[in-house]
Amino acid sequence: METKNSEDWGKPQRKSESSSRKSNHGPAEMRPALPPENREAPETGEETQNEEPRRLIPIQRHSLFNRAVRHRHKARSTSERRASDQADLPKMGKSVNERSAFNLPQGRLSPWRTPAQRDTGAQEASESSSTPGNGTTPEECPALTDSPTTLTEALQMIHPIPADSWRNLIEQIGLLYQEYRDKSTLQEIETRRQQDAEIQGNSDGSQVGEDAGEEEEEEEEGEEEELASPPERRALPQICLLSNPHSRFNLWQDLPEIQSSGVLDILQPEEIRLQEAMFELVTSEASYYKSLNLLVSHFMENERLKKILHPSEAHILFSNVLDVMAVSERFLLELEHRMEENIVISDVCDIVYRYAADHFSVYITYVSNQTYQERTYKQLLQEKAAFRELIAQLELDPKCKGLPFSSFLILPFQRITRLKLLVQNILKRVEERSEREGTALDAHKELEMVVKACNEGVRKMSRTEQMISIQKKMEFKIKSVPIISHSRWLLKQGELQQMSGPKTSRTLRTKKLFREIYLFLFNDLLVICRQIPGDKYQVFDSAPRGLLRVEELEDQGQTLANVFILRLLENADDREATYMLKASSQSEMKRWMTSLAPNRRTKFVSFTSRLLDCPQVQCVHPYVAQQPDELTLELADILNILEKTEDGWIFGERLHDQERGWFPSSMTEEILNPKIRSQNLKECFRVHKMEDPQRSQNKDRRKLGSRNRQ
């Protein structure tokens, strides 16, 4: 028994069949290849009804869709249709040659058609069928966006590209990862600049124009005309990949296989951006593997280098890079297999999640050795002339493209941090509350745990040596305090001037108002010293960091400029002590005050509320932290400005990992447009919403409630 909907679905399909019989090529080009016994269309009505549902792509039909299609047919003039038909007919003879150019088997090409294979009958049948995307866009038909069935499901009918095609594509990447990463981040910076300037220009134009309301009315009246001429579907890429003359492609949408499949006419711009983000993750992994392979084959396995280095030195220098490369190879292979399933990539974050949870521990081992690796490399350059000469000779090889040996050694750490950002880029483009969003959030969480473990591994090695060195330099005038602890590390150290108070001699000459003291600030302890000869420090006071309070003095003139008050609520003698301290500059005073006692008023304020309306900057020059309270910046990092000094220093919080620290303002440029800042915050909140304690608390309550009901 058929319903009314099935009858409505059947009518336009029979019409398309009747029109397609006028052309010899129409049915064969529109539908996937069928077995020989099913190639002929049935003649009887019953057979047609039994076979029709199997040919329909599962997209719900709505009356709005039909009206939009009919309106589009009426708007198109006869001359335009003839012109398009004449443009399509000459291409039909080239279809075989185009396929052979891709090195694709003929037997696997029939399931999808290319735009060059359309004739008049096939075009009319495709437009009257229920398949979306054949010239009809969601803007023309709102029913498509409201339909529960997405366009991605319709793309399941598209046949995958053979494995050899993707492997050849990956092998033709001509960039080393260092070049790839630099080009990508620089293009990202330039894209943000253009977006900022474009939106800002539009906002200025809207303020100058006095007839904005009338223009909006004219736009509403012209919506029907826009249905007749569909807008451009191609999305502007955020990051231009592989801009290299030796590479035969730049973007996912520029691949010949993608352009010939007609899929760009089906996908919405946001879905194309998502495809570009996933494609970048795969191609960047291929570039990274290429650089790792060069590190191993060109440097590590060099016979002359093996003779120069002691086995222990080689082990420290290269660590477990073979394990890292093996994981990267398997990871890349699975990503390639995923791309071979369909020319439209379904998802990659599930693969990232599995590898981050089960295999990326090799990165923690490698990165944790970074401190000893850098030290060993410097010692070898200084002490072994043969090593220095050989490395310089190997770096001149054209394979290295002028890149130093040290840039290859830090590849794993750069890759694991960049991989997290690539997953964030995917997360910003997937549909909210979808399965792909959940997978991306899980992958991002696992990668963040790996990155944190890598950072902790590096810090643990360097902190232990630093604490031992500080302990040896200290002499206690008071009760000794144990400095070395596994849970203690240095936050800041430096010299300040303590105000001792005016003292007048018999000659009425004022003695020195300030005297130098030296502070060691740890994460849980403050030690106040005086520097003595022999590079030693005499400790005369200390206090837990949680019992410190700071207060900035108002402008009292040049003498008391950059002066602040430090209060120890309970010092080494169990008494309250007050110190009036003077810094060398305003930025130094602000940095000490921020480190000694962070703003307690915002300690328990939510992440969302404390960052609203914050100024933002993006990093345009990389910066390496020189002191523990500074923040290392990478190109294209976006940061919120929390504190700014007049002498050019900024205390900021990086959005993608919420790390805080000081950095020179000359390394960044401000994002002026409020819309861009709001968009950056929105994306940040979406990425970190799994870490929101309120959200996790509510989630735990829901779980507890469900258990109680059971």
Curated annotation (Swiss-Prot):
Residues 123-137 have a biased composition (Polar residues). The gene is Ngef. The keyword Membrane applies. GO terms for molecular function: ephrin receptor binding; guanyl-nucleotide exchange factor activity. Residues 1-146, 192-234, 688-710 are annotated as: Disordered. One of its GO terms (cellular component) is growth cone. SUPFAM superfamilies: DBL homology domain (DH-domain) (SSF48065), PH domain-like (SSF50729), SH3-domain (SSF50044). Gene3D superfamilies: Dbl homology (DH) domain, Pleckstrin-homology domain (PH domain)/Phosphotyrosine-binding domain (PTB), SH3 Domains. Residues 612-673 form the SH3 domain. Residues 211-227 have a biased composition (Acidic residues). Residues 273-457 form the DH domain. Residues 1-20, 688-699 have a biased composition (Basic and acidic residues). The keyword Cytoplasm applies. One of its GO terms (biological process) is ephrin receptor signaling pathway. Residues 1-272 are annotated as: Regulatory region. This is Ephexin-1. Residues 489-601 form the PH domain. Highly expressed in brain and to a lower extent in eye. InterPro entries: DBL_dom_sf (IPR035899), DH_dom (IPR000219), Ephexin-1_SH3 (IPR035635), Ephexin-like (IPR047271), PH-like_dom_sf (IPR011993), PH_domain (IPR001849), PH_ephexin (IPR047270), SH3-like_dom_sf (IPR036028). The modification Phosphotyrosine is found at Y177. The DH domain and the PH domain are both required to mediate interaction with EPHA4. Interacts with CDK5R1 and EPHA4; activated by EPHA4 through the CDK5 kinase. PANTHER family: EPHEXIN-1, GUANINE NUCLEOTIDE EXCHANGE FACTOR. It is found in: Cytoplasm; Membrane; Cell projection, Growth cone. Src-dependent phosphorylation at Tyr-177 upon EPHA4 activation increases the guanine exchange factor activity toward RHOA. Phosphorylation by CDK5 upon EPHA4 activation by EFNA1 may regulate dendritic spine morphogenesis.
